[in-house]
Amino acid sequence: MSFTSSLRLDTNPITSPKWVHRQVPLRPHRNFVVCSIKSPSTPSLNLATDSASTDSLSRINSLSQVSGVLGCQWGDEGKGKLVDILAQHFDIVARCQGGANAGHTIYNSEGKKFALHLVPSGILNEDTLCVIGNGVVVHLPGLFKEIDGLESSGVSCTGRILVSDRAHLLFDFHQEVDGLREAELAKSFIGTTRRGIGPCYASKAIRNGIRVSDLRHMDTFPQKLDILLSDAASRFQGFKYGPEMLREEVEKYKRYAERLEPFIADTVHVMNESIEQKKKILVEGGQATMLDIDFGTYPFVTSSSPSAGGICTGLGIAPRAVGDLIGVVKAYTTRVGSGPFPTEILGQGGDLLRFAGQEFGTTTGRPRRCGWLDIVALKYCCQINGFSSLNLTKLDVLSDLPEIQLGVAYKHADGTPFKSFPADLRLLEQLKVEYEVLPGWKSDISSIRNYADFPKAAQQYVERIEELVGVPVHYIGVGPGRDALIYK
């Protein structure tokens, strides 16, 4: 399809003040996705009974035995909605990394809201087994709160959630230490969710962490916990630790251990046995590739690997077992917290996208920074993960804009091109973004359910992204509801 576009060079280089998140006095609305509890007598997808329905089922059923849904930006791309839809066609939905810093809100068919941070998104599909893998850090009070909320609303969790015996435990003190660490960093703070994720992974890395399997040995648990708490007290002056705290924590975790026991499993064995049995497995990634500890905008990253490699290390399955990976990317870009954001729109333009897209964090409620879609970063994510297809979300948010920009290239100040996404943040600060300007569309597309019915300009936008990135867009989101997903 041919169309006209123009190139525009951003004359304002990325500046350091953009990297540090400033709280914006906006009301924190929250995003949501809609899902329903599946009953045996109802169809697995509530889709229109036309050719689009047939195409969608064919698309989903063609996915490989082990498939994954991963974020392509800095998180908050809308992965939960796609996972919820796909989960109805998979036997297992598994989390492989992260912790309660990942979050989304889902609703059942009766409008009941579930705020989930640890339990995999497949929990509302009654035939789906949910696995929390060894790469996840588990905050037991948070997990039990989610389970209680689900059970009280009629969603059975018994026998449907497995927690890896190799997963590390995230304690309340990890969260306290997380806040103390941010306070130490002052103006250069990272913008963590303060859920204790970094400190827990740090404990894991220096090998004094406590794993789920340790709950089965309460005779040695107090000594291990004492080492952890003493280490935190020696590191942070503001952290007060004494014998009474240890006694209270040990008693609390004795109760937790008893309650968690039915959920504990050797999930590495479960996953590999399921692969041998030809069961279909969907891996749900938390956060996104641009927050990856190795490949993201370090140090403004998370502490795990939310890219393709994290699937294998976080679940204990072989790389050759992993097939289709779907990258989820917003039609524009958002970021929560500090860190580089080359295509960020400051001022009124950013506010417009923020309110139109209701861009406020599910986990923190913080307003998200907004900007144009960064093709350079997206291509980088596609290279790392080898995506077979993309899910372009929130395309409807761009409706009514007179023009839409794509950040298609980075250039040095002298105009020479820079052909990759740099690791050096100082270099990234100096680069300028080259934009391609495309026409907008002046109509609401949120009720459209067939790609052919899109305005020409919307089709041009989607197809230009495919052309620039080299990966097909198979799924397009035009609203929060389950039915607001177009299969291309």
UniProtKB/Swiss-Prot annotation:
InterPro entries from the UniProt entry: Adenylosuccin_syn_GTP-bd, Adenylosuccin_syn_Lys_AS, Adenylosuccinate_synth_dom1, Adenylosuccinate_synth_dom2, Adenylosuccinate_synth_dom3, Adenylosuccinate_synthetase, P-loop_NTPase
Could you tell me which residues form the transit peptide?
1-34
**Statement: the UniProt record of this protein carries the keyword Cytoplasm:** no
Q: Where does Mg(2+) bind?
A: D76, G103
Q: Which GO terms describe its cellular component?
A: chloroplast; cytoplasm
Q: Report residues binding IMP.
A: D76, E77, G78, K79, N101, A102, G103, H104, T193, R207, Q287, T302, R366
Quick one: a GO biological-process term for this protein? 'de novo' AMP biosynthetic process
Q: Please give the SUPFAM superfamilies that the UniProt record associates with this protein.
A: P-loop containing nucleoside triphosphate hydrolases
Q: Pathway, per Swiss-Prot/TrEMBL?
A: Purine metabolism; AMP biosynthesis via de novo pathway; AMP from IMP: step 1/2
The entry's active site is D76 (proton acceptor), H104 (proton donor)
**Function (record text):** Plays an important role in the de novo pathway and in the salvage pathway of purine nucleotide biosynthesis. Catalyzes the first committed step in the biosynthesis of AMP from IMP.
What family, per the record? Belongs to the adenylosuccinate synthetase family.
Protein name per Swiss-Prot or TrEMBL? Adenylosuccinate synthetase 2, chloroplastic
Q: List the lineage, top down.
A: Eukaryota, Viridiplantae, Streptophyta, Embryophyta, Tracheophyta
What is the gene called? PURA2
